[in-house]
Amino acid sequence: MSLNVAILGCGNMGSFITKAIVNGEAGDITLHTLIGTQRSIKKLEQLAELANCKWTTDPGTLEIDEVDLIIEAAGQQAVKDHMLSYLEKGKHIMIISIGALAEREVYEKVLELSKKSGGQVILPSGAIGGLDAIRSAAIGGLETVELITRKPPNALKGAPYVIEKGINLENLQAEIEIFHGNALDAAKAFPENINVAAALSLAGIGPERTQVTIAASPSLTRNTHEIRAKGACGEYSFKFENNVSPENPKSSHLAVLSILSALKEFQRTVLF
C-alpha cells in the first residue's frame, strides 16, 4: 500500500525530495500535498504539476486525515511553528532541520507529543554515519563526544554566526577555525550547515555536552566531518569526506540521500 506524504517546504531540499518521489527513488510513496510560501508560489506550482499533487501556501489547510507522513524541509522555525501541531494530531513526521531539536524545550515537547499521540518522529542521519554505534555506546556510558567539521568557505557564507561576528571568508589562504562550542550553540549559529551536530548530540550525550569545532578551509572541495567519542565501551572515531550536494552547496550529497534512505527504512518490515 502506497504511503501518502506531504512535504513542508519547496526549496532545494523539498525540490530534491519531490523529484526523488516522482522518480520512484524513495519507495512506494505518493506525494499528496506540497506546502510552500507566497514567495515561492511559482516554484510550488511547477513542482506540484510535476508530481501531480495538491499544493497550498497555508500549512493549516493540509488535509491531514489523508496523509500518513509529513516531511519538514523548511527550516528550524517551521519545526516549531507547524510540525509540532501535526505531531500532536497523531501524524508521523520527518524532521530534516534537526538543529531545532538541540533546544531542550523543543526536544522534550516532541517526546511528549509523540508519546501522547502515537505519531512517530523520523530523524535522517544526514551527512554522517556511526550514530548506531554512538547510541549503543551511550547506553554503556560515554564520557566525551566531539565533532570537527571542515568546509569550503563558500559552504559557510551567510550563516548567522559568520554575519554576526563579521568573519571574512573571502580570499582565505589557510584554514581558520570560526566556531568552537557545544552542539546547542552550533545549531543556532549555523542552522543550514550543521544539523549533523544536533543529530550526533541526540544520539549520544546531549547538545550541551557534545563539543563542536567548525573550520573554513580554502583547500577543501568536500565537506568533512570527524567524530571522536570516548566512553566505557572504548574509543571511536569516524571521518566523512562528502561531496557537496548538487542541489545545495551548503549541504552534502550524503545528507539528501539519507532522507531517501530514511523514507525507505520507514516502509520496511525488517529494520536495521
Which residues does each PLM region occupy?
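NAD(P)-binding Rossmann-fold cofactor-contacting core
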Residues: 26-47
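Extreme N-terminal starter segment of soluble prokaryotic enzymes
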Residues: 1-6
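A short helix->loop->beta-strand "cap" motif at the edges of active sites that frequently abuts
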Residues: 53, 89-92, 116-119
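Beta-loop-alpha module in the N-terminal Rossmann-like domain of NAD(P)-dependent dehydrogenases
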Residues: 57-88, 100-104
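Rossmann-fold NAD(P)-binding glycine/threonine-rich loop
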Residues: 98-119
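General beta-strand structural signal in soluble alpha/beta enzymes
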Residues: 56, 72, 95, 121-125, ...
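Hydrophobic/small residue at the entry helix of a nucleotide-binding pocket
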Residues: 13
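Active-site-lining helix/loop region of Rossmann-like oxidoreductase modules
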Residues: 8, 16, 121-122, 128-272
